[in-house]
Amino acid sequence: MSKVLVLKSSILAGYSQSGQLTDYFIEQWREKHVADEITVRDLAANPVPVLDGELVGAMRPGDAPLTPRQQDALALSDELIAELKAHDVIVIAAPMYNFNIPTQLKNYFDLIARAGVTFRYTEKGPEGLVTGKRAVVLSSRGGIHKDTPTDLIAPYLKVFLGFIGITDVNFVFAEGIAYGPEVAAKAQSDAKAAIDSVVAA
């Protein structure tokens, strides 16, 4: 039995293309892997705090006492990291907003990137500590960006996930959503076919 963590980040709720793909992924995964456990965390509906000058102090070990706000942030960071480490498959819904991931998803990454916890520095360089995971990224875009300089999502996620130890990453794209109903429908259809392949793998 595997445990699947699904991270939603779209601010568009029911109108979200990435949300629809995520729901389809969950539906297909449950159908093909009946015994698996799925956890859904909606980072838009329940956002995590922005890492600011005060909160960053909570993420770095020190002798100074933590403020109540820092204590809350550290507890949340611990919770998010424990949740991440407890799951085998990480599904990341990452719609493209202004060429990159949503703020809500970036805030999540900022809270789980902790030296000595999810990665560490060694004489040979940084080493990821979140290993043995598989990640699936579902990314919807209004335009066509895959394999072009305007796609900042795929390179960033490969680097970040690899940095914390997750190197098995599959991408599913739904592109050209804003190009009209026909293009959008084909994008969704192609993305669902790609999801079917990922789920069956």
From Swiss-Prot:
Enzyme class of the recorded protein, top EC level: oxidoreductase
Keyword Flavoprotein: yes
Cofactor binding remark: Binds 1 FMN per subunit.
Binding-site list for FMN: S10, S16, Q17, S18, M96, Y97, N98, F99, S140, R141, G142, G143
Signal peptide: none
Superkingdom of this protein's organism: Bacteria
One Gene Ontology molecular-function label: oxidoreductase activity, acting on NAD(P)H as acceptor
InterPro entries with a match to the protein in the record: Flavodoxin_fold, Flavoprotein-like_sf, FMN-dep_NADH:Q_OxRdtase_AzoR1, NADH:quinone_OxRdtase_FMN_depd
Cofactor needs: FMN
EC nos: 1.6.5.-, 1.7.1.17
SUPFAM superfamilies with a match to the protein in the record: Flavoproteins
Annotated catalysed reactions: 2 a quinone + NADH + H(+) = 2 a 1,4-benzosemiquinone + NAD(+); N,N-dimethyl-1,4-phenylenediamine + anthranilate + 2 NAD(+) = 2-(4-dimethylaminophenyl)diazenylbenzoate + 2 NADH + 2 H(+)
Record key words, sorted: Flavoprotein, FMN, NAD, Oxidoreductase
Membrane-spanning segments: none
Quaternary structure note: Homodimer.
Family stated for the protein in its record: Belongs to the azoreductase type 1 family.
Stated role: Quinone reductase that provides resistance to thiol-specific stress caused by electrophilic quinones. Also exhibits azoreductase activity. Catalyzes the reductive cleavage of the azo bond in aromatic azo compounds to the corresponding amines.
Identification of the protein by name: FMN-dependent NADH:quinone oxidoreductase
Organism whose genome encodes this protein: Salmonella arizonae (strain ATCC BAA-731 / CDC346-86 / RSK2980)
